Structure formats: structure tokens, C-alpha cells
Amino acid sequence: MSNSFEQISLKHGFMKHNGGVMFRNISENEYEFKSVINENHLNAAGITHGGYLAALIDAGAGTAAHRSAQNAPCVTISLDLKYIGASKIGDEIIGNVKILKKTKTLVFLFCELKCNDKIITSASGVWKILKIKS
């Protein structure tokens, strides 16, 4: 497995526009991703917007689902979020993903976002593995 992070936001799109996401495999069932909070990620209270944290989890956990499915395309079926803490501009957010179960068509996972070693968001989700015909 890779010890170094790679940029996964290479194509034009939402996550690249929002600062990008770095990603790495920890083991067959564990993955890690990270991003740094900038002023575009803040809400009116000056903390990271919950919508950005949701998008960050969707991107990072979705990439973990994709990698665990041998790089098959995967789409989010459900994503249940719990906002526990806060982060602010300049903070590095680290996401940890654990694949709980994988079938031929679904990936079930759990994810936590941490800032300064404190959990700020937790999520459980299900991704559909797509069978794309050539």
C-alpha cells in the first residue's frame, strides 16, 4: 500500500475548484484523505461549512469505495453524517475510511473527519458499484 498521498482532484470539477483532495491507501480496507480549509469553505459563523465537509467525505469515501471495488465506478446511494466539532481557515482536515463490507454491487463504509486529532464529522455510507458496459 502507498505511504504517500496523491492528488485525486485532477479533472475540472467541484472538488478541484474547492482546493482538491489528497488520498492514500493504508491497507486493503483502510484509506486516508486530507484537505486544507480555505476562506471559500467557511460559513457565516467563520467555521467550515457543513456542506463542504459533506462534499469532502463524499469525495474521499467515494474514492475509497472506488479503490476497494478494483477501480470500478461507484456512486453514492446513502450518506449519513453527524457533525460533532468544528474547524477553521488554515486547518488540515484528515479523513479516515474503513470499508465495513463489500458485495458484488455495494460497498458499505464508515468515515471520520479529524482536525487537530479531534473528530469533527462522522459518516456511514453505501456506494453502488457500477457495471459499465464497453
Per-region residue spans from a language model:
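Terminal targeting signals and extreme-terminal segments of soluble enzymes
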Residues: 1-134
